[in-house]
C-alpha cells in the first residue's frame, strides 16, 4: 500500500535511549526555529514516558539509492514518501478504533514546497515531528532492532519513522 521499498518492524520502547545530545543536534540544523513541528516548537513532554504508554510501536523505513546528480531530490522525496506512508498508517488505525495513534517522521517535515508558514503551520493536520526531535537516539534504537543505518549516507538514504498505537 505504501509503495516499493518500505520495511516495517514492531519494536519496544524498552529499546529506546533518549539523550539530550540527540535533541541538541536540532539546534544546529539550518532550519532551527523555522519549522512548526521541530524544536523549539514541540510540546515540553516526557517523550520516553509517552512512548511507553503505547501498546504497539513500529519502525517504518525505506532506503533509496542516490547519485551525485540527484542527492537533493532523493533526500526530499524519501522524506515525503515516508511521511505520507505514516499518515496512511495513522488513518488506517484511526478508522479501526485507534484514536491515539500517532507517527513521527524521519527528518523535518517537507510537505510544504515553499517552506513553513510564517505565523503557523500550513498543514496542521498532516504535518508531523521528526522522531529525532524527541531525543531518541535513532541509530542506537535501530541497531538494537537489527536495522543498520549508515551515517553519513553513502550511495543511499534511509528514512526511518515510527508509528505508535
Kindly give the residue locations of the regions a language model identified.
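GGW-centered surface loops in extracellular recognition modules
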Residues: 1
